[in-house]
Amino acid sequence: IYGMNSANGAVIVTTKKGATGKPRITLNANVGITSPTNVPEMANARQYMTMRNEAEINAGRPAYITKDELTKWQQGAPGYESVDLYDAVFNKHATQFQTTLSLEGGTDKVSYYGSFGYATDNSLLKNNALTYDKYTFRSNVSLKITKDLTASINLGGRYDTTNRPWFPFYDIFKSTRVNPPTTSIYANDNPDYYNNFSYVPNPAAMIDADYTGSAKERNKNLQTQFALEYNIPYVKGLKVKGTFIYDYNNYGYKATRKGFKTYTYGEYTGEYTAADA
């Protein structure tokens, strides 16, 4: 770190370089599991309807539902089951995988180091609705041209992609918190018709990229460094070094928003009525 507290301070990062010796191949792999540290537990349908009724009565208004209906919600009768929206959309755990393959070695004239890496993260959303993939490479070569002149070539690159639903992660999570636990995912439990929710869109529809749309982010990064270092003869410790650096960065974003409908089911008509989401 040079001049960290100054306006033009710089942080110098040195990447791994090859060492003299026979070629060595190394493979590293890591698998990880991620899970939320804490997810607030929401009221179930029985608790929600009980509190909703009490709130109306305490405000001097008629009960929200009749006693018979409340009993059905409390007992979880057919058609009155509690719906866990978070469980319908999110997995309890997500997996991560990372691997790196490297090769290094060298002689008294040439040393080299190269690596290729891959990492993936499936996130917590069900149906692989959100995925992240990253590819990296690194190549460092040092060549002793003469006794006093050394050349080095350092290359590094990264390519990563994120595929996700059109709806942002926060909106999906919010939908599982805001909507009541009394509305089922599908109208009349028919998977061909996403149920219409009163507050924010149906979270199960939100993660269905084929139904509501998707977004893709792409990052490309290339770092190159070419250097020549010359030791001044007869002056111990005095060196001259020239460096050429070229960096390339490219970011791409593509989103497709599909018009979609959610539905309500008429118990008496047996018909599904569409509502624009």
Each predicted region: which residue ranges?
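Transmembrane beta-barrel strand/turn architecture of Gram-negative outer membrane proteins
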Residues: 6-34, 109-187, 213-259
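Short structured motifs
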Residues: 98-100, 210, 225-227
